[in-house]
A protein has these predicted regions:
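Short, low-complexity disordered leader/linker segments with a strong preference
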Residues: 1-41, 403-409
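Periplasmic-binding protein-like
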Residues: 101-114, 134-136, 179-183, 232-242, ...
């Protein structure tokens, strides 16, 4: 009997050890809704239709990039299930799609949804649900507010910073400028306008001769451009989305107006704005960049650009490589993958935000040299540097230094 007892004791000890190791393994793995041993479910909302549909290519690029990641084994062995819906850049529709993603699809997080009004419409909802609204595709300053909105984080340089850089340039190079501003009549446009005024400081009132707003429902902004020229403005600040940016460039040429033209970064795509507007109409436009430009020959031997072009050829051959949206989608998707890798087996929503807020000197393959991604518990603005550029021939030429442009939030 003693031998049998010994065997039973050994067997029960072995079972206890197996149970203990299993519980240790499960203790190490933490999941919230949307994550399992095999999958990470990520939601996204894009304007695949409507007035801002040019940006839909960002979502399509992200879907292709996650397909690449899945083919390469996923993130820590988990495949990405990317669920992307159309909101037509309509905030009520964004709310509907966000609820669907969170409550029906049960995603772990919503990633890189596009537009200031759409994201503003779901910010309180996302924070009340404690679901990450991560790396939103808008540069509004309000996304850098971890104290009041700890579940919302931006990605690109903020709009106020960008127009502050333009203001500094104008004050230095054109101190007697008469400035006309065309801006979209929503949070997006007003954020840019505030940055410009803050950058001009006391001179804003005397230098700005016209502030003209437009609605996204307008079919054309031609009348606003004609009105702008009539003021005698010699500097034009163009705060628009791609469709209207291209219209403005064409109309300025058509009526023979020759201001120094500043075009906001989000409408500086060669593929979706400059080319349709006409290269001949776009000469000497000034903008700012934080990402490499595919059309710029200086990057032809760059390892990061080569990797991007190989990705496009293999995973998104129908995508326009010249469209700035493809570079954006690629860069922001790489940033999300980095944050999720850092989560390890702790895929709770809280840890996703913690890791997203712990990025140090991270570089995607498509950021300009000297620009890095840094976040912290009190810094939800991953990218805060830009470089000025001028359109020459069929491409943007960078000039000056990389400028750090932190504006409060």
């Amino acid at each position: 009997m003693p031998a049998v007892t010994g065997k039973l004791a050994a067997a029960s000890l072995a079972l206890a050890l197996i149970a203990a190791s299993a519980s240790t393994a499960s203790a190490q793995k933490k999941y919230d809704t949307g994550a399992t041993d095999t999958e990470i479910k990520i939601g996204n909302i894009m304007p695949y239709s409507g007035p801002a549909s040019a940006y839909g290519i960002i979502g399509r690029t992200e879907a292709a990039y996650f397909k690449k990641i899945n083919e390469e084994g996923g993130i820590n062995g988990r495949k990405i299930n990317f669920v992307s819906y159309d909101d037509a850049y309509s905030p009520p529709k964004t709310v509907e799609q966000a609820r669907k993603l969170v409550e029906s699809d049960e995603v772990l997080l919503i990633f890189n949804s596009l537009g200031t009004p759409p994201n503003s419409a779901i910010q309180k909802y996302m924070n009340s649900k404690k679901v990450p609204q991560l790396f939103v595709a808008t540069g509004a300053t309000k996304w850098n507010d971890p104290q009041n909105f700890p579940w919302t984080m931006g990605w690109q340089p903020n709009y106020q910073s960008e127009t502050q850089i333009y203001a500094k340039y104008i004050l230095k190079e054109m101190p007697n400028a008469k400035i006309g501003v065309l801006y979209q009549n929503d949070d997006y446009g007003k954020d840019y306008l505030k940055g410009l005024k803050d950058g001009l400081g006391a001179k804003a009132a005397s230098m700005i001769v016209l502030e003209e707003s437009y609605e996204t429902s307008e079919p054309t902004i031609d009348n606003h451009i004609v009105k702008m020229k009539a003021t005698g403005a010699d500097v034009f600040i163009n705060i628009t989305t791609p469709k209207f940016a291209a219209q403005a460039i064409k109309k300025i040429s058509e009526i023979g107006w020759k201001p120094t033209h500043f075009l906001n970064n989000v409408s500086a795509s060669v593929g979706s704005v400059i080319k349709p507007a006409g290269f001949e109409n776009s000469q000497d436009i000034i903008s700012a960049a934080y990402l490499k430009d595919v059309s710029d020959p200086q990057w032809k031997d760059d390892a990061g650009m080569k990797a991007f072009l190989e990705f496009m050829t293999k995973y998104f051959p129908e995508g326009d490589k010249l469209d700035g949206g493809t570079i954006v989608g690629y860069g922001v998707a790489q940033t999300l993958v980095e944050a999720l890798k850092k989560c390890g087996d702790n895929l709770t929503r809280e840890n996703v935000m913690k890791q997203a807020a712990s990025l140090k000197d991270f570089r995607t393959e498509v950021l300009l040299p000297g620009i890095k991604i840094n976040t912290g518990a009190n810094d939800f603005a991953p990218i805060s540097s830009l470089q000025l550029m001028k359109f020459k021939g069929e491409k943007w030429d960078l000039f000056g230094d990389v400028i750090s442009a932190d504006a409060g939030g």
